[in-house]
């Protein structure tokens, strides 16, 4: 009986570890959270899971973390990762707020229900060794290194703050200036914070493009930190809204092209099909040459090629940039990034915020009448005067108009939008209105995603925020 009880206990521990790993996407290559995609010995995967259990220390199978120090220069750093993974495993079981991806999501009750696809977990195991092999250029910093770099996180060195993190300017001991993103401990429970940290780190591991922020390293010592390449011109938001000087059109147009190239890469050319979910002016950094860099992958999701979209709850993102289908139904695919990109283009054209702080009016609602009339003089930032290229402005206006269409199917993909912005379709394309494009659209889309219903939902949500 004692032997049988012990086996039952081991089986239960194994199942708990499997559940936690699946929650974090560390085992499931088909899951939108399984972003690390590291190579490991599949034959040892089951024993690796067992050896991770705190109740199975006597197992003769070696832990998957046992060789960490061979890869990481400091055993202290490796132990930090071990403790972090163990802290997740020991937490009480709870599911993260991610609804499984659906093969096809109903927008109305009139549609027939479709079966949810079964997800098959892979046999690969997440290991610190495999993780560090993925990006050997990344440094694993100690807390003391980051504290010294930021004058112990002096508030004067804070260059940004969000709901879940603070960003500090720092200077490393080698003289390199970096931006240090410090995840706030009070924002989320420890289990969820660590999960989000690993998920974001895993997504960044697959990103390598000039128009994406570059990670220098990270730290799990006394908190969770990302160390990023410093952008001397700050964010696009600070240049558009926080400066008295007018950002010249040449730079604005270059930034628009850079963001488009970066998003096209994430959606089409990246090893993983990545949906950013939080494209906004404050998440676009500008390097020394005003090259746009997409940053903050904290809300990003990746989708396998054969899955049309993902459905999430609760809805996360920034009010004013949320696409109707995401805001109203939780649908996540490339088209929600396209919508947010359209809002961003309107901000670049007008220097108005996504939501006006005084009137609380959406820039989309404000700009649509001018876009429909092609009224350039009414929509362009008056500070620009006539100091812009009319053809380029026309391209950006047309692109923005297509991006913010309330029906997702009517929005072009980023590959197409890059062509439009660069004028690769010829001048005739610029004369074509977004509404003139012929495209098959399901009737339920037209019913559920009318402009009026979306605006009503926006007003309702805005009212809730103000209460």
Curated annotation (Swiss-Prot):
Q: Would you kindly state one Gene Ontology biological process term found in this protein's UniProt entry?
A: cellular response to ethylene stimulus
Q: Which reaction does it catalyse?
A: L-seryl-[protein] + ATP = O-phospho-L-seryl-[protein] + ADP + H(+); L-threonyl-[protein] + ATP = O-phospho-L-threonyl-[protein] + ADP + H(+)
Gene3D superfamilies, alphabetized: Phosphorylase Kinase, domain 1, Transferase(Phosphotransferase) domain 1
**InterPro entries attached to this UniProt entry:** Kinase-like_dom_sf, Prot_kinase_dom, Protein_kinase_ATP_BS, RBK1/2/STUNTED, Ser-Thr/Tyr_kinase_cat_dom, Ser/Thr_kinase_AS
Record localization: Cytoplasm; Endomembrane system; Nucleus
Q: Where is the composition biased (Basic and acidic residues)?
A: 1-24
Q: Where is this region: Disordered?
A: 1-73
Report one GO cellular component: cytosol
Q: Which residues carry this modification: Phosphoserine?
A: 282
Cite the entry's keywords alphabetically: ATP-binding, Cytoplasm, Kinase, Membrane, Nucleotide-binding, Nucleus, Phosphoprotein, Serine/threonine-protein kinase, Transferase
Principal localization? cytoplasm
Q: Which SMART domains match?
A: S_TKc
Q: Which Pfam families match?
A: PK_Tyr_Ser-Thr
The stated induction of this gene product is: By fungal pathogens such as Phytophthora infestans and Botrytis cinerea. Promoted by ethylene in the vascular cylinder of primary roots and in the root cortex in the root/hypocotyl junction zone.
Q: Could you say which protein family the record assigns here?
A: Belongs to the protein kinase superfamily. Ser/Thr protein kinase family.
Q: What is this protein called?
A: Receptor-like cytosolic serine/threonine-protein kinase RBK1
Q: Which gene encodes it?
A: RBK1
């Amino acid at each position: 009986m004692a032997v049988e009880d012990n086996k039952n206990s081991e089986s239960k521990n194994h199942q708990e570890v499997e559940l936690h790993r699946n929650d974090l996407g560390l085992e499931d290559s088909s899951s939108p959270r399984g972003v690390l995609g590291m190579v490991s010995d599949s034959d040892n995967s089951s024993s690796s899971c067992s050896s991770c259990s705190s109740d199975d220390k006597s197992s003769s199978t070696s832990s998957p973390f046992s060789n960490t120090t061979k890869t990481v220069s400091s055993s202290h750093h490796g132990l930090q990762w071990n403790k972090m993974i163990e802290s997740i495993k020991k937490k009480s079981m709870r599911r993260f707020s991610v609804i499984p991806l659906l093969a096809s999501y109903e927008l109305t009750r009139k549609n027939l229900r479709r079966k949810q696809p079964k997800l098959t977990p892979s046999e690969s195991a997440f290991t610190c060794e495999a993780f560090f092999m993925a990006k050997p250029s990344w440094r694993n910093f100690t807390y003391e290194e980051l504290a010294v770099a930021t004058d112990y996180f002096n508030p004067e060195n804070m260059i940004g703050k969000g709901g879940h993190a603070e960003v500090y300017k720092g200077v490393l001991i080698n003289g390199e200036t970096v931006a240090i993103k410090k995840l706030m401990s009070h924002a989320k429970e420890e289990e969820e914070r660590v999960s989000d940290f690993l998920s974001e780190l895993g997504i960044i591991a697959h990103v390598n493009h000039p128009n994406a922020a570059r990670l220098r390293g990270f730290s799990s010592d006394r908190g969770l930190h990302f160390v990023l390449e410093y952008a001397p011109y700050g964010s696009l938001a600070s240049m558009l809204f926080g400066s008295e000087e007018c950002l010249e059109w040449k730079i604005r147009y270059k930034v628009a092209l850079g963001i488009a190239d970066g998003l096209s890469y994430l959606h089409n050319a990246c090893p993983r099909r990545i949906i950013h979910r939080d494209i906004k002016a404050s998440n676009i950094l500008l390097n020394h040459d005003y090259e746009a860099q997409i940053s903050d992958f904290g809300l990003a999701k990746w989708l396998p090629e054969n899955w049309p979209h993902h459905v999430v709850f609760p809805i996360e993102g920034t009010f004013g940039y949320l696409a109707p289908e995401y805001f109203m139904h939780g649908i996540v695919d490339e088209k929600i990034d396209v919508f947010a990109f359209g809002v961003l283009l309107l901000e670049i054209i007008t220097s108005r915020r996504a939501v006006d702080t005084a009137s609380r009016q959406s820039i989309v609602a404000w700009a649509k009448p001018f876009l429909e009339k092609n009224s350039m003089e009414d929509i362009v930032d008056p500070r620009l005067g006539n100091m812009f290229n009319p053809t380029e402005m026309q391209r950006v206006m047309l692109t923005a108009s297509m991006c913010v269409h309330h029906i997702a199917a009517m929005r072009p993909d980023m590959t197409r939008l890059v062509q439009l912005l660069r004028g690769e379709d010829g001048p005739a394309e610029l004369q074509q209105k977004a509404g003139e494009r012929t495209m098959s659209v399901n009737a339920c889309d037209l019913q559920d995603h009318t402009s009026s219903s979306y605006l009503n939902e926006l007003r309702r949500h805005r009212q809730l925020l103000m209460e």
